[in-house]
């Protein structure tokens, strides 16, 4: 009886999943791991440095830097949800992950991505208020408001992603447990099921368009309003500085969203997209923003750049 019960449970939910890595490129896994590992180290060092500087310097406890602090924490969690396991696959052939471990990774990947998307929207709003309503900046964005915004960003990510776990747990897998990927994501797991995954597809599409899609629209609207304000500045030098800063921000935002939407829509409509391209892009959208954000939002900011140079001179 016990054996039969275990057999039925395994047929419905496999006890483990096998993560293949990048199919067709297993021989190159070691070489592929080098740039990914290098970027991961850069992300850890860059975001860790930003956090250290902002936390230890009380003069930087202002709205813009507090948002940057939130972004750095999110970046550290985002890349750490997938990179350690991916490197374990590439270096140690550690392809196995438990069923619940896979669901946990899936939950954090999507929840942290949604949280970072909300934080990028909050940072765009911060820049809008700073440039378009500078006299009301400190009254609109005080520490209490920023704390509530941060909590709302996290709560929204958790709230919208939690149903993914329920939608996956209702699916039977009929013994299928091999994922052609380096990490667990919602549609990758759902496609292994031996029943209809229409509810998963519909809910995933709804979340992507209504949550992440709305973030993109509102971020774009914020930067359009910022652009209008910048064009009205009397000094050409001030205009160029504002264009340079906003242009860098927009580039990082595009790097964050374009590969993410490519990965999302490839699962649903990209039957002819090579799996290697899909998997590499699916990893890059979780790794490249954590590498770039400290450079664009942090080191590109004069106050933080000065603190970093001061740290370097003190050590030398």
Where in this protein do the model-derived segments appear?
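Transmembrane helical core of 7TM receptor-like proteins
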Residues: 1-316
């Amino acid at each position: 009886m016990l054996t039969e019960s275990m057999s039925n449970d395994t047929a419905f939910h496999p006890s483990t999943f096998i993560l293949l890595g990048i199919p067709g490129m297993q021989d190159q896994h070691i070489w592929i791991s080098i740039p990914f590992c290098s970027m991961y180290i850069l992300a850890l060092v860059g975001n860790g440095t930003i956090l250290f500087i902002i936390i230890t310097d009380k003069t930087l406890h202002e709205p813009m830097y507090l948002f940057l602090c939130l972004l750095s924490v999110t970046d550290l969690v985002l890349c750490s949800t997938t990179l350690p396991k991916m490197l374990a696959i590439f270096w140690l052939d550690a392809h196995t992950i438990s069923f619940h471990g896979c669901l946990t990774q899936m939950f954090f990947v999507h929840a942290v991505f949604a949280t970072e998307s909300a934080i990028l929207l909050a940072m765009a709003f911060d820049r809008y208020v700073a440039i378009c309503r500078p006299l009301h900046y400190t009254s609109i964005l005080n520490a209490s408001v920023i704390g509530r915004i941060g909590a709302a960003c996290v709560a929204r990510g958790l709230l919208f992603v939690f149903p993914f776990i329920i939608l996956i747990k209702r699916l039977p897998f009929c013994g299928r447990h091999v994922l052609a990927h380096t990490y667990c994501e919602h549609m990758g797991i759902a496609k292994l099921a031996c029943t209809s995954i229409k509810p998963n597809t519909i809910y995933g599409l709804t979340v992507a368009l209504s949550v992440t899609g709305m973030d993109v629209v509102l971020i774009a609207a914020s930067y359009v309003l910022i652009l209008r304000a910048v064009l009205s500045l009397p000094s050409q030098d001030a205009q160029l500085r504002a264009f340079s800063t906003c242009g860098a921000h927009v580039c990082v935002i595009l790097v964050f969203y374009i590969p993410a939407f490519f990965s999302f829509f490839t699962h649903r409509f990209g039957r002819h997209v090579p799996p290697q391209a899909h998997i590499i892009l699916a990893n890059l959208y979780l790794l490249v923003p954590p590498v770039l954000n400290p450079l664009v939002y942090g080191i590109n900011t004069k106050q933080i750049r000065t603190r970093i140079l001061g740290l370097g001179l003190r050590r030398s």
